[in-house]
């Protein structure tokens, strides 16, 4: 590794006519160098095979267009500390950015759209930051898979994806944080989270097929999320998941249950759950020894809380039925009309 800055490290100007993969592999690029991309349309796939390379857009007009023929726009195979910042990526047949193995990458402020696979895919990698990216019309917006751990997914926007907005898939994908992201109008889930000790905090999930799925693991935490307008299910905890904490979330105007818990030893605490179309909280037949405490439930039909499980503890919840002639659909349809502009605005990015 080079340690003496001016003698070894460089800012290298790059144009669309240059083969970036070949440039990185050449003796002209060393660890720690910055590739400063001139504005223009780049038709190429870039494999970054050296550590600590920073690939930075010089302006907003840096566009990587795969023209529906190239696979991944950027491939980071078993390298460390790569930064990709400020690039528009569109029309690739695989993923916008694929991280395989390695660790410590920074994926920041990119706009990724129209991938056949995923916006950002992280495979068997750890300690990555995925921050302030806007992802539209991919399969999953951000996918963590095959034992990806200790990743930070913060302030990203995923809209109109064919799969999930954000996903940590299967039990080995643990110790990840999803904070202040927006998932809007995705076909499947806003957040599909498998694994242990994951954090879901202050995310906004609007008009997705389903809001949140929690499966295969234990000890994950969800605090301060807003879930509204789901069609298939809202917040589902699967049988066999232990010690999940759901606290301080706002769950309103969803077609099915506000929270469906089929797991064991969960804590459902101080949530606001209102105007959902198929119970506020459903404790399924496999649920056992869960604590449901200090929640506020308003006009969920047919019941605010439906306990079908074993030895669940329901304490100090505030429950209010619907007013006469009031239904969730009436209230939610009015709210949707009034809030339409704010929802559309939220899909444009994180301020």
What are these regions (language model features)?
Residues 33:
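Glycine-centered, small-residue-biased loops immediately flanking beta-strands
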Residues 350-351:
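Short acidic DE-rich linear segments
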């Amino acid at each position: 590794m080079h340690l003496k800055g001016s003698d070894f490290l460089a800012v290298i100007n790059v144009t669309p006519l240059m083969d970036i993969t070949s440039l990185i592999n050449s003796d002209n690029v060393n660890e720690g160098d910055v590739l400063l991309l001139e504005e223009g349309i780049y038709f190429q796939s870039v494999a970054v095979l050296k550590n600590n390379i920073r690939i930075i857009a010089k302006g907003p007009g840096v566009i990587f267009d795969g023209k529906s023929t190239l696979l991944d726009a950027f491939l980071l195979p078993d390298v460390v500390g790569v930064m990709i910042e400020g690039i528009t990526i569109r029309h690739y047949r695989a993923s916008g950015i694929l991280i395989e193995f390695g660790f410590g990458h920074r994926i920041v402020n990119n706009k990724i759209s129209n991938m056949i696979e995923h916006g950002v895919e992280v495979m068997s990698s750890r300690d990555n930051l995925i921050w302030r990216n806007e992802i539209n019309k991919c399969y999953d917006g951000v996918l963590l898979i095959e034992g990806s751990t200790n990743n930070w997914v913060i302030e990203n926007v995923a809209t109109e994806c064919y799969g999930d907005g954000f996903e940590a898939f299967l039990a080995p994908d643990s110790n990840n944080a999803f904070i202040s992201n927006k998932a809007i109008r995705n076909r499947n889930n806003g957040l599909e989270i498998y694994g242990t000790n994951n954090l879901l905090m202050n995310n906004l999930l609007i008009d997705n097929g389903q809001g949140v799925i929690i499966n295969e693991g234990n000890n994950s935490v969800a605090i301060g999320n807003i879930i509204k307008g789901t069609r298939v299910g809202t917040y589902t905890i699967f049988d066999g998941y232990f010690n999940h904490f759901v606290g301080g979330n706002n769950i309103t105007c969803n077609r099915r249950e506000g929270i469906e818990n089929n797991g064991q030893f969960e804590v459902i605490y101080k949530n606001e759950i209102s105007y959902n179309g198929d119970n506020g909280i459903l404790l399924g037949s496999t649920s056992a020894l869960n604590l449901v405490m200090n929640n506020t439930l308003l006009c969920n039909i047919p019941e605010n809380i439906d306990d079908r499980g074993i030895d669940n503890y329901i304490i100090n919840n505030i429950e209010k039925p619907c007013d006469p002639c009031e239904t969730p659909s009436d209230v939610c349809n009015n709210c949707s009309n009034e809030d339409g502009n704010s929802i559309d605005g939220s899909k444009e990015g994180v301020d």
